[in-house]
Structure formats: C-alpha cells, structure tokens
C-alpha cells in the first residue's frame, strides 16, 4: 500500500465519523420512550466525546501528512441504516443501525491498520488501533442494548 491509500482511508474514516456525529445526535433527540433513555444517553455521549474526537484526530493526522480532510461537499452520506426511524419509539431500529455502522467502521479501521503497516506509517497505525478499540467497545455496548430489547 502507498501513502495515497493511507490518505484515502483516513479521508473516508473522517467523513464517516462526521456523518456519525450527525446521525447519533439526531437519533438521540428523535427517540422517545422510557426504554430509549439509556440508548439516547449513549448516542449523545458517543457523538460528543468519541466520534467527534475521532474526526479531530483523523483531521490532525491528515494535516500531518500534508493532506486535508474532506469538507461537506467532498463526501457522500452513506449511513442509510442510521437515519431516524419513522416511529420515534423504535429504538431497536436505531440500535441495529448503530451495530451495523460500528461493524463497518471496524472494517475501515482494520483496513487502515493494514495500509499503514504496508506504508511503514506507525503513527497512523497506532491511531487506527486506538480508534478501532473504541469502535469495538461501542459495538459491544449496543449489542448489549439489543439483547435488552429482545
């Protein structure tokens, strides 16, 4: 893999994280009902503290590599499964959407780790490993929510 491939994956991950912030925040305000309280809280916390921090870390790394993160007109929104449900009490569809997104993010960060290893870029590799751990923890949390809703 080349440095160009690392930069491409960093840009993709940055766009995904920004889109996730928007979708997590939106869902945290759209969901209603007592059973959704914990899900709403987790979405808000993750959007504000983790996903936005990931985007900032990715943007910083892109800058260090003399590249720039994509702006809003440069990336395509793809998180169809994270769109707010028609029924605001349908927390299960949001939970499933989060699990699906986290699995996609995990694959992106694994690809970034491989690309960084092949490009001999240990700084990007370390960053991707760190973020991968966060994404795996969040997926586990939402799988737990899923079991509670079954």
Language-model regions, residue ranges each:
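Iron-associated oxidoreductase/ferritin-like identity signal
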Residues: 1-150
